[in-house]
Amino acid sequence: MEDTRLKSVISKLKPKPLDIITLKGDGSNRKFYRLKFKNSSAILILPQEGFYGKREALSYYHIGKFFKKSGIPVPEIYEFFEDTGILLVEDLGDIHLFDIPDEQKLGFYKKIILILAEIQELVHEFPLKHTLETVVYDFNLMWEKEIIAFFKWQDLSVSKDFLDKIKEFFVKNFPSYKLKVIHRDFQSKNIMIKEDKVFVIDFQSARLGPGEYDLASLLLDPYVKIFNDFELVKKLALKYCEVVSKDKEEFLRNFYFFGIARLHQAISAYYRLSKLGKPWFKKYIPVAKKRLYFLLKKFFVELIKIYEVNNVL
């Protein structure tokens, strides 16, 4: 218990835990501990140091409470120590959707699509004042956090003329959409399975934005091998389209566009995390690049031509 914050919060708990187990945090800068009591357990989340960590914890608390009240399957929040940003939440076990064998995954995805559709309809009640960073996913967020980050974290040297050309492409193709509630990182490591039930975690970055973005995060997820089959991706995407009653042509256009935005984001994140001492993310870079190349070649020929001339992919 080297962290003084951990010692402090443990001293406030009644009853005291019988054992404290450190858990791996994957891509997060937070620290996670499983507290074992006589007949139960809970997860303690320590925020990253500084103002951002506390702000992130506050968003987690308010959005988590909102989702729970709205019937979304998320971990119950037992305690929130606002002065430190420490959270004590329900223990959902250790099995993420990522861990489920490929041959068993498909049945879960059908359930998850229904949960995603429920989340996205909570627009009018969503606690906007507790969003982290921005209230809305818009063009500027996509451009700075996903497209520019894609080049930055790969250390790709690109000219102003090149950036002007690709910005022109993204401006021209950025679609109009109805605002929905989006998770912003809706992928297999942020979905847990307990007793065959699905739970959504790591929702602190939720905000308003295009529903197709979260669907693309889910179905183009580089962690999941079954989505190397594009026909399966399209089949599940159309299942979502049917559930939310969208125009098929407009929906697919938006899905593919936000799919390439999301894959830019994923690739930049894998490079960034690898450079920050988490090398296990490197193995997902080729998968993400292959899927991005496929989408660009099939649906966005204008952009792939610019990329190929500049040896981007």
Where are the predicted features?
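All-alpha amphipathic helical-bundle segments outside canonical DNA-binding/catalytic cores
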Residues: 78, 136-138, 248-259, 283
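ATP-binding pocket architecture of kinase catalytic cores
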Residues: 33-137, 158
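An alpha-helical support segment within catalytic cores of ATP-dependent transferases
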Residues: 5-6, 10-12, 124-135, 141, ...
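ATP-binding glycine-rich phosphate-binding loop
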Residues: 18-36
